């Protein structure tokens, strides 16, 4: 028996199910297909899911996109999981608080130095990602200085530390 509208059944739709000419009713649900976490609609691919989330659940869409993003205070460089927490914190600095983090000039390549180790970055987002590394503490002694015993989370930090010992800075 031939389907009267084969083109209609082959179209992918932004709908709960995808049309398939193989199934009698034309509706199948693929295992592992992307679906909406709010209304449990299944989509043909992630582009349809993303479009649905933007249109139907914009607050959830924005929250999902910002998941894992850190918001940095430009006065004291503390990081916060949400913009609301950052704004609340910034009020504690008072109205006269001035940013202590460097502001990039427009005439030269912008540089953003890490206040913890001095390493510089060309973008604020790179500095933010790097600062997360300082917050993650390695088990004590992972990379320890043999001269003074200071611990480092990464081998590169220990290497820079040894250079400072060699220059007599420590």
From Swiss-Prot:
Keyword Nucleus: yes
Ranges in coiled-coil conformation: none
Keyword Zinc-finger among UniProt keywords: yes
Highest taxon listed in the record's lineage: Eukaryota
Subcellular locations according to the entry: Nucleus
C2H2-type ZnF: 34-57, 71-93, 112-134, 143-165
Main location: nucleus
GO CC annotation: nucleus
Spans annotated as Disordered: 1-29
Entries under PROSITE patterns matching the protein: ZINC_FINGER_C2H2_1, ZINC_FINGER_C2H2_2
Key words, A-Z: DNA-binding, Metal-binding, Nucleus, Repeat, Transcription, Transcription regulation, Zinc, Zinc-finger
Gene Ontology molecular function, alphabetical: DNA binding; DNA-binding transcription factor activity; zinc ion binding
Ranges of biased composition (kind: Basic and acidic residues): 8-20
Family: Belongs to the krueppel C2H2-type zinc-finger protein family.
Primary role: May be involved in transcriptional regulation.
Name of the molecule in the record: Zinc finger protein 576
Organism encoding this protein: Homo sapiens
Annotated gene: ZNF576
